[in-house]
Amino acid sequence: MNHIQGSLIYEGKAKRVFACENPNRVLIEFKNDATAFNAKKRSEIDGKGRLNCKISAALFKLLELNGIPTHFLELQSETFMIANKINVIPLEVVIRNIATGSLCRETPINQGTILNPPLLDYYYKDDELGDPILTERRLKLLDLISTSQIEKVETITKNVNKILKEYFDDLDLLLVDFKLEFGFNSLGEIVIADEISPDNCRFWDKTNSDPKERILDKDRFRQDLGGVIDAYEEILKRIERDSSNSS
C-alpha cells in the first residue's frame, strides 16, 4: 500500500523520517550519506540507501517471523519503508561476538578474540556528547527506562543475536557485532527501531581469510578500503539467494 509522504519529522545522518496520513505510522527514507566517527568523516555513496533499506526490510521480516517485535511494516519503494511511529529510547545497544573496533582500541583485548558470552554494552545516544558508554549505575541514574524494561531490551538483544548469528552463519558470514535501537510503540510496547544493515552491523566473509578483503560492512568506509557498495551488494545477494532457496 502506498502512503502519501507528509512533513519531515526528523533527519538523521543516514535517514529521514516523514509523517504520513496515518498518525501512527511514518515513512522512513534511507539516504546515500555515509558517515563515520560521529560524522567527522562524511561522503555520499550512490546506492547505499537502496541497499540498506532492502537489507533492513529483509532482516526485520526475519526477526518478526521469529517473534521479535520491530517497528517495520512494509517497503514503500527501494529507499522508503513504512514503519510504526515510536517514541525512541535514547540508547544504543551494542552486542559483540568477536573483538574488533573500539573494544580493541579501548582495552587490551586482541582483535579477533571470540567473546563467549557475547559482550553487551549500552551507549547514550547523543552526537554532541559522542555517544558515551554507560555503566550499569549511569544507566540507572539517567532513568531512561525502568529496570524491567532494561531486562526486556537485553533479552530481545540476546535473542536477536542468536537468530542473526545462526542465519548469517548459513550464509557464510560471521556476525562480528551490531547495534540496535529501541522505542515504544503506540501500545507502550518495546520494539526494535532504526535499521539492521551493514551500516550498524559488522560482517566478515567466512570464505575469505584476508583481514581486509573479508570485511563486508561500513568498516570499508571507515578504513578507506573502498568497495563499499560491492560489500553491501554481496550481503543483499546472499540474503536474497537464501530467500529464493527457502521459497
Curated annotation (Swiss-Prot):
Keywords: ATP-binding, Ligase, Nucleotide-binding, Purine biosynthesis. Its EC number is 6.3.2.6. GO terms for biological process: 'de novo' IMP biosynthetic process; cobalamin biosynthetic process. It holds the Pfam family SAICAR_synt. The keyword Ribonucleoprotein does not apply. InterPro entries: SAICAR_synt/ADE2_N, SAICAR_synt_PurC, SAICAR_synth, SAICAR_synthetase, SAICAR_synthetase_CS. It is an enzyme of class 6 (ligase). One of its GO terms (molecular function) is phosphoribosylaminoimidazolesuccinocarboxamide synthase activity. It catalyses: 5-amino-1-(5-phospho-D-ribosyl)imidazole-4-carboxylate + L-aspartate + ATP = (2S)-2-[5-amino-1-(5-phospho-beta-D-ribosyl)imidazole-4-carboxamido]succinate + ADP + phosphate + 2 H(+). It comes from the Bacteria. Belongs to the SAICAR synthetase family. HAMAP family: SAICAR_synth (MF_00137). PANTHER family: MULTIFUNCTIONAL PROTEIN ADE2, SI:DKEY-6E2.2. This is Phosphoribosylaminoimidazole-succinocarboxamide synthase. It comes from Prochlorococcus marinus (strain NATL2A). The gene is purC.
